[in-house]
């Protein structure tokens, strides 16, 4: 007998607050968590650890298919556990990002990782954070949410985050970067950023995180 495992997808542009929302939903629902944005970095790191050539589809595909990774919500952070080891800080390194770009360019690797992401949908349920979770990866998900916010608000949030780290940045530069990324994401040929037809669209521009979580939970309860 197969146990039904509900899937909640949360898509949206960079800086809308998807990560925080997904982490809180996973904690409140007791569900598993998938941070799809980190999955290519995780694979790149696994390849480096195992000495697999970053340009070798032959070596990367089996690694992707059997990727031993968990995403665990702890406090206000998501810990990434690769083969039993916390690699959260390693994932943020620039060289990991560059390696991820190389593996993401390989079609067979992308297909293998797509199947691996779908395997996260296991009991008791899954909250999946990304840009195409509801439109490509989990098209049959019971609950689909698209979290948005104005580019100005997202730039403002990012600026506050950087200032808290002691970094001074110009608002207009941040805004320009976000607008350029939005344009790329929404107009790309493969899996453009858009809400699924049956998604709840939440605009968090003038909402705090508690309000966003409350609306999301109400929607989830109405669907499950």
Curated annotation (Swiss-Prot):
Gene Ontology MF, one: ATP binding
GO cellular component, one term: cytosol
GO terms, biological process: nucleobase-containing small molecule interconversion; pyrimidine nucleotide metabolic process
Keywords, in A-Z order: ATP-binding, Cytoplasm, Kinase, Nucleotide-binding, Transferase
Catalytic activity: CMP + ATP = CDP + ADP; dCMP + ATP = dCDP + ADP
Family stated for the protein in its record: Belongs to the cytidylate kinase family. Type 1 subfamily.
NCBIfam families listed in its UniProt record: cmk
Protein name, as recorded: Cytidylate kinase
Organism the protein comes from: Aliivibrio salmonicida (strain LFI1238)
Organism classification: Bacteria, Pseudomonadati, Pseudomonadota, Gammaproteobacteria, Vibrionales
